């Protein structure tokens, strides 16, 4: 389903500095002048693959530094030229590229995104502030775009949550975490209870629980979004910023 991009109405309040302050947060969230805004759809995945924005040729940032990727241990950073573990190489998504809670109404994380439909590398390493609709109204999720894909619709966002389902790339997590596979649950959708998060490698369990705790196990929530400056906390993890 295509989503029409519409003007965004924020739940956050404007600080005197022109930044966006989450309801009970201290971090300043600064909008990008002329940046994207609208409404979008969401879903989840965790396929362990090297993300699209980790390839230098897909990057158009001031430093031309792509998203960091890691060796099979999920921790040791590898060169950007190393092939993805999902197609026979030895480069995987780093285990620290998981969502994390800032406070009761704000979280930081990462996403695969498209704003044109299909593969869209133009906004690699940009950040979007997502404001939840419906049951999660009052909460926000600030994500950095680190991946994209041919199966994405226009203005859609897919969040990498461990145990979120491997999707079309079924081999990466199996190879990275054998004998204790990190796929978890169904190919699409992943685990269906917080208790199943304990079946994942320990380093991935916090990101799995995030879905059930901060997101209250709401599947595929609708969001409004606005492009914002990437917080230092996110850039320190990905090593990339637009």
UniProtKB/Swiss-Prot annotation:
Q: In which tissues is it expressed?
A: Expressed in larval carcasses and gut, and adult gut.
A GO MF annotation of the entry reads: cellulase activity
Q: Which UniProt keywords apply?
A: Carbohydrate metabolism, Cellulose degradation, Digestion, Glycoprotein, Glycosidase, Hydrolase, Polysaccharide degradation, Secreted, Signal
Q: Which residues are glycosylated?
A: 79, 103, 217
Mind listing the GO biological process terms from this record?
Answer: cellulose catabolic process; digestion
Q: Which Pfam families match?
A: Glyco_hydro_45 (PF02015)
Listed under catalytic activity are: Endohydrolysis of (1->4)-beta-D-glucosidic linkages in cellulose, lichenin and cereal beta-D-glucans
The EC category is hydrolase
Task: Write out the catalytic residues in the record.
Answer: 47
Q: What is the protein name for this chain? A: Endoglucanase
Q: According to the lineage, what is the superkingdom?
A: Eukaryota
Can you list the disulfide-bonded cysteine pairs?
none
Q: Where in the cell is it found?
A: Secreted
Family statement: Belongs to the glycosyl hydrolase 45 (cellulase K) family.
Tell me which EC number(s) this protein carries: 3.2.1.4
Q: Where is the signal peptide?
A: 1-21
Name the source organism: Phaedon cochleariae
Gene Ontology CC terms, in alphabetical order: extracellular region
């Amino acid at each position: 389903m295509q989503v029409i991009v519409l003007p965004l109405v924020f739940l956050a309040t404007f600080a005197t500095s022109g930044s966006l302050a989450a309801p009970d947060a201290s971090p300043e969230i600064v909008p990008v002048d002329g940046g994207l805004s609208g409404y979008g759809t969401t879903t989840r995945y965790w396929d362990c693959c090297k993300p699209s924005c980790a390839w230098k040729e897909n990057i158009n940032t001031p430093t031309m530094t792509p998203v960091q990727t890691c060796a099979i241990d999920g921790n040791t950073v590898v060169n950007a030229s190393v092939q993805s573990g999902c197609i026979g190489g030895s480069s995987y998504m780093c285990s620290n590229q998981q969502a994390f809670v800032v406070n009761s109404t704000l979280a930081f994380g990462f996403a695969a995104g498209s704003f044109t439909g299909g593969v869209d590398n133009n906004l690699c390493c940009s950040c979007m502030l997502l404001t939840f609709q419906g049951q999660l109204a009052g909460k926000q999720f600030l994500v950095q775009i680190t991946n994209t894909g041919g199966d994405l619709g226009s203005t859609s966002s897919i969040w990498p949550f461990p145990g979120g389902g491997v999707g079309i790339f079924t081999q990466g997590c199996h190879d990275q975490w054998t004998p204790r596979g990190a796929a978890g649950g169904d190919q699409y959708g992943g685990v269906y209870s917080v208790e199943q998060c304990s079946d994942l490698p320990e380093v991935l369990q916090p990101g799995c629980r995030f879905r059930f705790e901060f997101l209250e196990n709401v599947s595929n929530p609708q969001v409004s979004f606005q492009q914002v400056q990437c917080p230092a906390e996110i850039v320190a993890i990905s090593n990339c910023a637009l």
